[in-house]
């Protein structure tokens, strides 16, 4: 029983970390695109 809880906890943390990294990557890419568009002469 304890092993199941631990393994589920680890899987849960991995999922949360991956989601956080994915969200951060999307925000970083969006910031780059916005910066590139802002630097272009209108």
From Swiss-Prot:
It is a single-pass membrane protein. It comes from Enterobacteria phage PRD1. This is Putative uncharacterized 4.5 kDa protein in genes IX-XX intergenic region. Its main location: host cell. GO terms for cellular component: host cell membrane; membrane. Keywords: Host membrane, Membrane, Transmembrane, Transmembrane helix. It is found in: Host membrane. The chain crosses the membrane at residues 10-30.
């Amino acid at each position: 029983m304890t092993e199941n809880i631990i393994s589920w906890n680890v899987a849960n943390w991995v999922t949360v970390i991956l989601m956080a990294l994915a969200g951060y990557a999307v925000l970083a890419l969006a910031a780059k695109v916005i910066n590139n568009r802002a630097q272009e002469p209108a």
